[in-house]
């Protein structure tokens, strides 16, 4: 009869287990060190007033949505933003049916669950929200304390350490003709375009803050395979207003195209920024006026001091891949 040497087997098992534990411990130490290093680097982005901008999110956590959400939470811990500006399409693909739609959990609550993301969110409507019940998107502020959407278009001022930023948050889908008279976008036709445009003009006219940023979902300028008529409609309705207030408007920031683009056109001095998707990005090529473009997923960080406004484009690894700087003259 053959007997196995169990003593040797136990020694081997213990040794293997020790190796595994040491490897795991070393990996954790590397991750902790890397996170600490990242936090120190991210801290340098902080200004007197800080904001995150994220959009084109709702993929039920798939693709890069969950990793980017976790990254946002980690960076928020280092930078301490006052709010997260959600520049449309928090929900793909057909919007939401009600405030109780399960998509609120799978697209938003369970994804952006990091403790540092339990702060004010300032959303605007995107074209995908308009495929569903847009009033439910507004009414969700009665369900979630962090969903501070005051209207289809509204303004918000942040003032800290003597530095002020005015956000002018607008509803761009009704400004584009192709969304009208369509059963796919049932709430568009009931929106009063003229009322919104007059409100934007008046709000910019009365703005006295150090910095003014206009945020909408659709781009004024962009490289895209989408119908160029979208940009032409935006330009015909908004550019005259922006031109009247070009001394005040620092940036127009949007989403919709699912990549990063920084564009300067004409002599109005405004930076036109396309913020990428926080879940699934698309290819991009330079176009007329392109300063920078990238197909990376991610989000943007805005930081302001009295004399300087910065927008940092952050990829899905937490790297700053482009910086827009504006200075007070």
Protein language model regions, located:
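Generic beta-strand structural signal
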Residues: 53, 86, 265, 304-309, ...
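N-terminal secretory signal peptides that target proteins for export/translocation
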Residues: 1-14
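Residue-level signal for glycine
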Residues: 318-321
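N-terminal active-site segment of His-dependent metallophosphoesterases
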Residues: 34-102, 223
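Active-site flanking residues adjacent to catalytic metal/cofactor-binding acidic residues
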Residues: 55-56, 88-89, 170, 216, ...
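Bacterial N-terminal signal peptides
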Residues: 19-29
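Receiver (REC) domain switch-region micro-motif
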Residues: 84, 212-214, 252
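Extended active-site neighborhood of metal-dependent phosphoesterases/phosphodiesterases
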Residues: 43-45, 50, 92-211, 227-251, ...
